[in-house]
Amino acid sequence: MPDFSIENEISKLINNKHCTIVGVDEVGYGSLAGPVVSAAVFFPKHDNHITYNIQDSKKLTPKKRLEIYNIITPMVKWSIGLAEVHEIDQYNILNATHIAMQRALRGLNSNIDYVIVDGNKVPELPWNAKAVVDGDNISISIAAASIIAKVTRDKLMETLHIQFPQYNWNKNKGYGTKHHLESLHKYGKTIHHRNTFAPASGITKLYNK
């Protein structure tokens, strides 16, 4: 289970028990449709006795994710950043993800001391930062960010599903399930599909109601 070990190590390293250490994670990296969404999360207190079963969002059921989301969002400082489909197509998914992370961090409007990012790459930032491989299984701040980003993006894709029900986005959230791929070939691609991602990149037919 993730805990505050990394956050506490960084606090000791910079000799500041009350520093602002922000965890960052994203969702939607490999999706065929919809934006990439990042969350930035700061816990005012590092108390390992108060974990609320926070863990990598991928290990939680949708019901449990929402339950934890509702518990933690009032008690942490958090912000969301998005990179839209046209930005993913223009800049590539890695750069668009970094843009989403930068937007999430700027949205905190806080004096940030240190940033910990899930993965092996850190976006260009004006703060000290480090990448943490498998960070959503190690750091509570990153795990909380993964939950908030996931719940936020899922809600967004469920809203888009109302307009485009053929693609089943309320269930697959834009990822390449069999049903989604079949619908993509049958109905064509929408404005929410990533043109630089296969198979949308090879489909010329556009969705028309």
UniProtKB/Swiss-Prot annotation:
<dbReference type="InterPro" id="IPR036397">
    <property type="entry name" value="RNaseH_sf"/>
</dbReference>
<dbReference type="InterPro" id="IPR022898">
    <property type="entry name" value="RNase_HII"/>
</dbReference>
<comment type="similarity">
    <text>Belongs to the RNase HII family.</text>
</comment>
<dbReference type="GO" id="GO:0030145">
    <property type="term" value="F:manganese ion binding"/>
</dbReference>
<protein>
    <recommendedName>
        <fullName>Ribonuclease HII</fullName>
        <ecNumber>3.1.26.4</ecNumber>
    </recommendedName>
</protein>
<keyword id="KW-0479">Metal-binding</keyword>
<keyword id="KW-0540">Nuclease</keyword>
<keyword id="KW-0378">Hydrolase</keyword>
<dbReference type="GO" id="GO:0003723">
    <property type="term" value="F:RNA binding"/>
</dbReference>
<keyword id="KW-0255">Endonuclease</keyword>
<dbReference type="GO" id="GO:0005737">
    <property type="term" value="C:cytoplasm"/>
</dbReference>
<feature type="domain" description="RNase H type-2">
    <location>
        <begin position="19"/>
        <end position="209"/>
    </location>
</feature>
<keyword id="KW-0963">Cytoplasm</keyword>
<dbReference type="GO" id="GO:0004523">
    <property type="term" value="F:RNA-DNA hybrid ribonuclease activity"/>
</dbReference>
<dbReference type="GO" id="GO:0043137">
    <property type="term" value="P:DNA replication, removal of RNA primer"/>
</dbReference>
<feature type="binding site">
    <location>
        <position position="26"/>
    </location>
    <ligand>
        <name>a divalent metal cation</name>
    </ligand>
</feature>
<comment type="function">
    <text>Endonuclease that specifically degrades the RNA of RNA-DNA hybrids.</text>
</comment>
<keyword id="KW-0464">Manganese</keyword>
<dbReference type="InterPro" id="IPR012337">
    <property type="entry name" value="RNaseH-like_sf"/>
</dbReference>
<feature type="binding site">
    <location>
        <position position="118"/>
    </location>
    <ligand>
        <name>a divalent metal cation</name>
    </ligand>
</feature>
<dbReference type="GO" id="GO:0032299">
    <property type="term" value="C:ribonuclease H2 complex"/>
</dbReference>
<feature type="binding site">
    <location>
        <position position="25"/>
    </location>
    <ligand>
        <name>a divalent metal cation</name>
    </ligand>
</feature>
<dbReference type="InterPro" id="IPR024567">
    <property type="entry name" value="RNase_HII/HIII_dom"/>
</dbReference>
<dbReference type="Pfam" id="PF01351">
    <property type="entry name" value="RNase_HII"/>
</dbReference>
<dbReference type="InterPro" id="IPR001352">
    <property type="entry name" value="RNase_HII/HIII"/>
</dbReference>
<dbReference type="GO" id="GO:0006298">
    <property type="term" value="P:mismatch repair"/>
</dbReference>
